[in-house]
Amino acid sequence: MCHSCFLIQQGRIADGMCRPKHPKFKLLKTPFKETDKLTYNRVYINQYLVGFGIGFYPDGRLMYFYSKDGYALKESDVENKKWENARNIGYWRTEGDKIKIEYFVCSQQGTYFREQGEIKSDSIVFYQTLFSPIKGKVVRETYYVLSDMSFE
């Protein structure tokens, strides 16, 4: 039996860009509020997986960056990137120092990733609550630090 025949593709990749077929960003239901806590049009780099980064626009949009070679994110991975040609896009919302992001990736037939965290000066910390049978509730922190890399 063909199990994959019943999977619904929610996203598509065209010209290196991943987009949802029918956008359903839940975060767009949250009213947008301007903030001065983020630095716009610059890349925040994941401190553990340095091949990943996030860039914020002042209007609530974001781009998620990946290293082309699988190693550290470089200027060449970011240059000439804008909303229209970014591999992955999403949205952000803030409430004080708290931030929520949501972005779409085409893996697993298309998935929306949602993260919550807080803005701390030139860094953003996202928290994920996990359960370990040995330790119980565990909170994993993922740090993104502001870099010198910029985009349009």
Regions found by a protein language model. Give the residues of each.
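Lipid interaction determinants
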Residues: 5-89, 95, 100-152
